[in-house]
Amino acid sequence: PYIPRRIRVTLSPEEAEEYAAARRMYTNFIRAHQIDFSERDGWTRFIMLSARLPGGRDAMKAYLKQRAIAQCSRAKLNIVWDIMRENRSERIIIFTADNDTAYRMGEIFCMPVLTHKTKAAERKDFLDRFRSGEYPVLLTSKVLNEGVDVPEASIGIVVSGSGSTREHVQRLGRILRAKGGKQAVLYELVSDGTS
C-alpha cells in the first residue's frame, strides 16, 4: 500500500566543511573526557561536563551545529520544495526530529507547524484545515508520531528522525490509513557523510 523512497542528500561544500569542523570539535571533547554514549549515563555526562569544563560550551554548540546541518541542509530544503511542487494535488506531512527544524522550515515555507507546544485548539484547527484541503501540507516534530490518524495524507517526507524502527512505523502509519485505495509514498531524506 505504500512506496518507500530513500533520497541520499549531499551537503554543499560549505556545509560539509562546517559539519566536519563542528563534528571534529565535538568528538575531540568527548574523546578527551572519555564520554561513552553507549553507557546509560553517557548523554547526561556529556551535558554535565560541557557545562562545567573549559571548552565544554563550545563542544555543545558544535554538537548542535553539526546536528542542525545534517538535519536541515539547503539540499534537503530544495528536495522538500521539489517534492511539494511535484505533488501539489496531494496532502503532505513533513516530519522532523526536533522543534527547531520544524519551526525553521515553517518559516522558510510559510507553513503551519505542529509540535508538542501547539495548543489543543490550534492543533485541532490545523488538522481540520489539513483534512479539508485548506492546508495541503503540515510540518510536525514527533507530535503526529502516535495517536493521530490523518488518512487524507498520501505523501510523507522524513527530513530528519531518530532512525528508530518504531518511529518509522509510526510515521508511516500516519499516511497509510485506508482511504480510497490510495498509493502512499514515504520519502526519507538522508544526509551523506553525516553521523
Where are these regions (language model features)?
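Hydrophobic/aromatic beta-strand patches that form the interior of the parallel beta-sheet core
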Residues: 7-9, 112, 157, 187
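A short beta-strand element within the Helicase C-terminal
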Residues: 139, 146-162, 167-168, 183-190
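Conserved helicase ATPase core of P-loop NTP-dependent helicases/translocases
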Residues: 91-96, 100-148, 167-169
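Short, glycine/serine-rich, charged loops/turns that create anion-binding
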Residues: 99-100, 118, 163, 176, ...
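Amphipathic alpha-helical transducer elements in NTP-driven molecular machines
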Residues: 13-19, 77, 124, 141, ...
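Conserved segment of the helicase C-terminal RecA-like domain
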Residues: 174-195
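Interdomain linker/hinge connecting the two RecA-like lobes of the SF2 helicase core
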Residues: 1-91, 96-97
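Switch/connector loops and helix/strand junctions flanking conserved nucleotide-binding motifs
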Residues: 1, 17-18, 148-150, 164-169, ...
